[in-house]
């Protein structure tokens, strides 16, 4: 796919008139991004973000050399993590078949020397010679590593240098050499427990070291969720492929067209405009602030490597559209992709009954059904009444709230309390006052008494969680006023709430 000595003009001269017209037509396509994704992976249903990430990896960023001679890589590394049967290996196979210079290997079956390089004795001269490994063979191409998490830790360490510095250094048996490994790495990994646990962070789900994780520009998480519409569409696609292989594959562009376009577009070396520079810095600041703040802990630590990833992805977007300059719209898409790969995992539904369920499990011991808060009603304090005894066998579903909705409510509460803080000296609100204020704010959404009770229950649980779990809100203690036991009891039941001064509001 790559030839450093060629220019866009020389590649154009190698094409026939018809081929060049097709390449030119593709460059003018308003829907090029989507059409390239669907044409490259016609047999894979959905997973659009992964397709976009892999496509940008094929175009790549612009490699640079600083004044001191330090090389900055332009290659984009992508890791796909997910449950079994979510088309991870299919992506790797597609890239391996499409790219002229791609090497496909399995992490479990590859040793450190098999991936980098080995020193062996030549049969004829009996001297030590270097035997190229997968990363060297994929120089100026793509190295697809399946079962990446199954690699031994010492074998993972061997590719640290290749992933960041794009070289492989060898000092074995009197042979000392530094070899090029300018390759993009497309890796696929399975979660530790077999299925992705959305309540844990990405780092806890996969068996990869922190240095390796930071060297990947994009992480994509594929979770096998039961969804009737998606399951039907996937089943239809697979059955169509088995029954009508040729007819079912619908491509806008042929693979040869894409190869020619890729070869032509890769000759562009887009420069970052001043406007885009400022935009990149602004977006990086947003990522860093979000990483250091409250509710969500991102998939991994946001470092300068993620800033470089954003630059490479922006350059790749500009290359794809055959632009000589990186524009803010390219940076925006790069930030969106990077943001998706960082944040997407951290959005499980929030279980607002978590504390009560833990309490029930403790009280019940081995008697309860695992995973269900199904004891009679000790939560409401009515345990033992005849009415509730008849409902003992019915499991009580836990109250869950979508993560985005939980963030929206918490941001609304924080903004209101901070506004009160700015306007008045006595900014603290009682918990009951805060609940009443929120219900008044959403009164247009409430149509019945039952809905009002439900919304009140939700906001009370959210406030409780923000106070005792996320520590976004602080209950003011009544220090030194222990004399009046009656007053202190009412104070404990309905305390004053203020926002934690160290809390940084989410975007």
From Swiss-Prot:
Binding site for ADP: 305, 308
Highest taxon in the source lineage: Eukaryota
Domain MCM: residue ranges: 32-239
Subcellular location: Nucleus; Chromosome
Main localization category: nucleus
Residue positions where N6-acetyllysine is found in the record: 329
One GO term of the biological process aspect: DNA replication
Gene3D superfamilies reported for this sequence: 1.20.58.870, P-loop containing nucleotide triphosphate hydrolases
EC number assigned by the record: 3.6.4.12
Catalyzed reactions per annotation: ATP + H2O = ADP + phosphate + H(+)
Modified residues (Phosphoserine): 375, 390, 448
Disordered: annotated span: 365-392
Maturation and modification: O-glycosylated (O-GlcNAcylated), in a cell cycle-dependent manner.
Modified residues (Phosphothreonine): 477
One cellular component term from this protein's GO annotations in UniProt: nucleus
Key words, A-Z: Acetylation, ATP-binding, Cell cycle, Chromosome, DNA replication, DNA-binding, Glycoprotein, Helicase, Hydrolase, Nucleotide-binding, Nucleus, Phosphoprotein
Classification via Pfam families: MCM (PF00493), MCM6_C (PF18263), MCM_lid (PF17855)
GO MF annotations, alphabetized: ATP binding; ATP hydrolysis activity; helicase activity; identical protein binding; single-stranded DNA binding
InterPro entries for this protein: MCM, Mcm6_C, MCM_CS, MCM_dom, MCM_lid, P-loop_NTPase
Family to which this protein belongs: Belongs to the MCM family.
Subunit-level organization: Component of the MCM2-7 complex. The complex forms a toroidal hexameric ring with the proposed subunit order MCM2-MCM6-MCM4-MCM7-MCM3-MCM5. Component of the CMG helicase complex, a hexameric ring of related MCM2-7 subunits stabilized by CDC45 and the tetrameric GINS complex. May interact with MCM10. Interacts with TIPIN. Interacts with CDT1. Interacts with MCMBP. Interacts with DDI2.
Note from the entry: Early fractionation of eukaryotic MCM proteins yielded a variety of dimeric, trimeric and tetrameric complexes with unclear biological significance. Specifically a MCM467 subcomplex is shown to have in vitro helicase activity which is inhibited by the MCM2 subunit. The MCM2-7 hexamer is the proposed physiological active complex.
Function: Acts as a component of the MCM2-7 complex (MCM complex) which is the replicative helicase essential for 'once per cell cycle' DNA replication initiation and elongation in eukaryotic cells. Core component of CDC45-MCM-GINS (CMG) helicase, the molecular machine that unwinds template DNA during replication, and around which the replisome is built.
Name of this chain's protein: DNA replication licensing factor MCM6
Gene label: Mcm6
